[in-house]
A protein has these predicted regions:
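Long, charged N-terminal accessory/stalk domains
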Residues: 1-371, 406-409, 413
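Conserved, carboxylate-rich catalytic/transport cores that coordinate ions
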Residues: 2-7, 14-30, 308-652
Length: 652
């Protein structure tokens, strides 16, 4: 059970070296910076304004960096929409951007960020303008096409002295009324330009002296004037608009091609964003520091084994300008220490289960090694199948060897790779290979159901016993001996006694074992009552003692919970066998054509459900039946100052 030994340290440095020291610590990725304003030892100095934040323009600088982040992130998002996307598998196989921290810092400082953004922004603006012009031309064409047969422009008609012309539309429903009204005005000439289901385009000519009366009549009929200010005919205007559209389409195509070929610019933006994210992290860390006119104080946590490397690195980088001091931890300090788990390659992936529940406190023990054993058994037993296990192991191994994934995903892949071994091993025990029965099965899932049930309960019994033992051990370490007995060792002995008693009742030859078990359970039940009364120094301890004994029902429930190991394992095996039976009913030709596809599809579903059940129910057994006996969690994760890895991977 490994939790890294942490050491508290403090650095005192000249103010002009602050940015360099923070950059060095960020590259080191080993120091978690403490907030000095939250520490009691520093609060008085801050209140009296003996010390203050080293950056008086902290908020302004942070806001500036945030705006730069937003600009870069927005530009990356917009540019990625044009750069050809690779398929998911190809993108995962692609080697990520790799660079050293120092090179990223130097490149970030030297890069003309504003010019890079302006250059790309200009292309987007050109594209937007071209699309806008094209859309306006298309809209005008759609309105103008119906007037293509108009042989004279409205502006030309305005030059007549003795005639007045009206060009526009009326609703189609008003056509009959128009004809009727025209009879009252024999000097009017009406020409139809176009007709649609909703409106009719007309050209109306009249003498100048009756223009007002004509306009009034047309208005009553819903006449709408055709707004056209060009000297060229509509059909000529349509030709010009078509040319404009083609021109803008060519411009759009060329601009989109330029944006699609901007992969180098996209990489530069990604590198710059990670650089700005690093600057932001360092800027945010300044809020946790204390400063005078010339000096800055920094306190933090670091793994004990890395202290010497820090001393050497600071001396090489800054000479004697930075003072490093190591503090011995007191009992009060241990409550503040962050937790960093440290396990070997086989155990480390199972830290995911522990972290999902809660990290242990620094003064506690890491339960991950024990969790790894039980979770390995639980998951394997609930998904037991050789084929499923080999696929899980092979698939995760291939992904780890072939794909370039982030460290967090790689840890998950290693986790499931180990679980794949457990699934295959239990598949050997059950003799199951993709639902087919193998001749060397140690336990037959169709006939040995009671045996599997007993194994499940025994595994549950061992799990509960382990939890109770760890509970007793934890309380002894805390010097709470009464709790160690009442909540741990006494219940271990009671449950062992009850198990022996049950064995004696079931097997007459073990009658003496049953007698011993009966006394073992009775003596420890009485012991819980006596220890509770003695520790309370009065009969008030009797109530908690009786309530504690009443919890025997919860232990029965815990053991019953472990029957899911049998139930889910048998369910997966039965469903897989049923799928095989369905495929076997097909005629030979169908069996080896569509039957293969159906076999793969059905077993994929069953495999997914088996793994999902194993993952969820395995975690449930750990969290409730195991952790519920001894583990509180509540630890604070160790969070060192680290560089951002949104797009880049750092070379050592």
């Amino acid at each position: 059970m490994a939790i890294s030994h942490m050491q508290e340290l403090s650095l005192l440095l000249p103010k002009d070296l602050l940015d360099d020291v923070l950059s060095y610590l960020q590259n080191l990725q080993s120091v978690e910076i403490q907030d000095l304003q939250a520490k009691e030892t520093w609060q008085g100095a801050f209140e009296q304004e003996l010390v203050w934040n080293p950056d008086k323009s902290f908020s302004e600088h942070l806001q500036t960096l945030t705006r730069r982040q937003e600009k870069l992130a927005n530009m990356i998002e917009r540019l990625q929409a044009f750069v050809p996307k690779k398929k998911l598998l190809e993108s995962l196989k692609e080697v990520p951007l790799e660079i050293t921290f120092v090179d990223l810092e130097q490149a970030g400082q030297a890069r003309d960020e504003e010019a890079l953004l302006v250059n790309i922004q200009q292309q987007f603006q050109a594209l937007a303008r071209a699309q806008e012009v094209k859309e306006m031309a298309q809209s005008e064409m759609a309105e103008l096409e119906k007037w293509a047969s108009l042989a004279v422009t409205p502006s030309a008609l305005k030059h007549f002295k003795h005639l007045r012309a009206f060009v526009g539309t009326i609703p189609s429903s008003e056509n009959n009324q128009l004809n009727a009204r025209l009879r009252d005005y024999p000097n009017l000439e009406v020409r139809e330009v176009f007709t649609s289901s909703t409106e009719k385009g007309i050209l109306v000519l009249c003498k100048a002296e009756v223009a007002k009366e004509t306009q009034a009549v047309l208005t009553e009929l819903g006449f709408k004037l055709f707004e056209y200010a060009f000297e060229e005919l509509p059909k000529e205007r349509l030709v010009a608009l078509q040319a404009t559209i083609k021109e803008q389409e060519a411009l759009i195509t060329s601009t989109q091609a330029q944006l699609a070929a901007s992969n180098e610019e996209l990489q530069q933006l990604k590198l710059q964003l990670d650089y700005i994210l690093n600057l932001t992290s360092r800027q945010e860390s300044k809020e946790a520091l204390a400063s005078t006119q010339n000096l800055v104080a920094l306190e933090g946590w670091m793994e004990q084994g890395q202290i010497e490397d820090l001393k050497t690195g600071l001396a090489q980088q800054f000479g004697g300008a930075v003072l490093l001091q190591i503090h011995e931890l007191t009992e009060a300090d241990r409550q503040r220490v962050p937790t960093k788990l440290k396990n070997n390659a086989l155990i480390e992936p199972f830290e995911l289960v522990t972290e999902m529940y809660s990290l242990p406190k620094y003064e506690d023990k890491d339960p991950t090694p024990v969790v790894s054993v039980f979770y390995f058994i639980f998951f394997g037993m609930m998904a037991a199948d050789i084929g499923y296990g080999l696929l899980l192991f092979g698939g995760t191994t291939w992904a780890l060897k072939t794909l370039h994934v982030k460290p967090s995903l790689a840890k998950n892949l290693r986790f499931f790779r180990i679980l794949g071994i457990g699934v295959a091993l239990w598949g050997v025990i059950y003799g199951s290979f993709f639902g087919f029965k193998l001749p060397f099965a140690l336990i037959d899932t169709s006939t040995d159901v009671i045996t599997i049930l007993i194994i499940s309960v025994v595994i549950g019994f061992v799990t509960v016993m382990t939890g109770l033992f760890l509970s007793g051990k934890k309380n002894i370490r805390m010097k709470d001996y009464a709790a160690a007995y009442n909540s741990g060792f006494a219940w271990m002995l009671i449950l062992i006694g009850l198990a022996l008693l049950a064995a004696g009742r079931l097997f007459p030859a073990l009658a003496m074992v049953g007698f011993i078990g009966e006394w073992l359970a009775t003596v420890n039940a009485v012991g819980i009552v006596l220890v509770s009364i003695i520790s309370a120094k009065s009969l008030k301890g009797l109530g908690p003692a009786l309530f504690n004994l009443y919890n025997i029902s919860s232990y029965v429930g815990d053991l019953v919970s472990f029957t899911r190991l049998m139930a889910l394992g048998l369910a997966g095996a039965s469903i897989g066998s049923a799928f095989n039976l369905i495929v076997s009913l097909f005629p030979p030709f169908a069996r080896f054509s569509i039957g293969i596809v159906l076999f793969l599809a059905l077993h994929s579903i069953n495999m997914f459900l088996s793994f999902l059940s194993g993952y969820v129910h395995g975690a449930r057994l750990i969290f409730v039946e195991f952790f519920g006996k001894f583990y509180d969690g509540g630890g604070k994760a160790f969070k060192p100052l680290k560089p951002a890895e949104k797009y880049v991977r750092y070379k050592k």
